[in-house]
Regions:
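Extracytosolic ligand-binding ectodomains
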Residues: 1-185
Length: 185
């Protein structure tokens, strides 16, 4: 594909019509919009009002967008996320039992996985019989996480040399305004 336009805005902006009109004038086939759901909802609404009716693509910040955009605005759009609803019914049921509501977005499963990762590292240091708070203990925690494989709610993952997780991502689309897993990639 070819990038036909690149636009930006400042933090706190709520009017995106100038940027969207510029994009529209370039005749795009799709728009990549890696923003958070509150802004994306405003952007999709304003895109519709200026006649920019193409699929939008986004990242994990879109998780929860269905509360901020209509089914028509979300039609044919895709986003990637760390978790797809239904991937772990046990986690979802436990979350609902604890908090009385469905999990709000992918941050809950990610938070669980972050805590599980720390516990994984601490357990390795404890199993080695090291004294908490020592440099050796801290190094054992770091080494275990860096070399381990974690079975998390968002999937199985390891960490690369930059300490970034290596794992699959969920590719989702919207069906009747609700996110639906298309594939794991």
């Amino acid at each position: 594909g070819t990038i036909v336009d690149q636009e930006s805005y400042s933090e706190g902006d709520v009017d995106f019509k100038t940027q969207l009109t510029s994009i529209l004038g370039k005749g795009p086939e799709t728009v990549f919009c890696p923003n958070y759901y509150e802004e994306v909802g405003q952007i999709l609404s304003q895109a519709e009002s200026v006649g920019l009716n193409v699929p939008f693509l986004g990242g994990d910040g879109w998780d929860g967008l269905e509360g901020y955009a209509t089914a028509d605005q979300l039609k044919d759009s895709y986003f990637c996320a760390n978790y797809a609803k239904g991937s772990s019914p046990e986690f979802e049921d436990a979350y609902k039992a604890e908090y009385g509501e469905d999990y709000p977005n992918g941050f809950a499963p990610l938070g669980y996985d972050a805590a599980k990762t720390v516990v994984y590292g601490v357990q390795a240091a404890e199993d080695a019989g090291l004294e908490a708070g020592t440099d050796e203990y801290k190094q054992a925690v770091n080494d275990a996480i860096a070399s381990g494989t974690i079975e998390g709610i968002t999937g199985t993952f390891t960490f690369d040399e930059h300490h970034d997780p290596v794992k699959k991502t969920a590719i989702l689309t919207y069906v009747d305004g609700k996110p639906e897993l298309k594939e794991m990639f």
